């Protein structure tokens, strides 16, 4: 697959366009349909798994971003890229990200590595090699998982794309004027899920307070943090930011971020944030947007070829 530097189409001349175009207009037909499996977690909730199998002994596990799922174009594009290179693929939905709301009060968040652990443990028995890919929130989740687990079973390499390594920095950055539309879209979806969760568990939080918040930071402070055992948003961000786990990673891991990613801050885009791990490489491209790297001609996007090449090297 192509190994040259990423050059965006001339019409997609900035990070906003490189983010928005693939999110709205990229259409993906899977090379083979997903096969759905639902697994039960140790706490008696469920996770939905979506497989693409071809009797390979190499498996790629894909973790999606905030308010995403296995049907997002960036997930399916990455799935096709690896399936075409003889990998089996497993994409999964976090708690609350399927058509059916999950059973327990807890939902998903950037540090919920117990669920990624459950997915890896469920899949690993059939594969000699497992590779992890995470996008955005899923990138943070993947990196935190690796830092917690060290060298784990058959997990060989990982790739974290559009990784918000400092959650507080990323959250506050969404509350800037240029990111108003992104934050509004996220909040509309998050509030809808929170209302459904409140219908299940009316004592979980104050519904009136939910209707009065408008930022990701406030949502994390009111909903995400207390529901998942954190004191407040600051506590959640400090305990779950991937930057605090990178030096403990024990397998080859590639972080791929774009300098023009509208979701990432100069703090996140400073390579010093990655520390001095012998196992973590941090590549920053000048172009790409957030979970983007689009083109108009090739079926495989640059970031997808990048991940395939990294795993095969």
Listing of model-derived features with the role each one plays in the protein:
Residues 73-91, 274:
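Short amphipathic alpha-helix adjacent to the substrate-entry channel of hydrolases
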Residues 14-54, 294-298:
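N-terminal cap/lid segment of alpha/beta-hydrolase-fold proteins
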Residues 275-291:
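Catalytic histidine neighborhood in serine/cysteine hydrolases
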Residues 288-302:
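Catalytic histidine-centered segment of alpha/beta-hydrolase-like enzymes
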Residues 249, 255-257, 261:
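Short beta-strand/loop motif that positions the catalytic acidic residue
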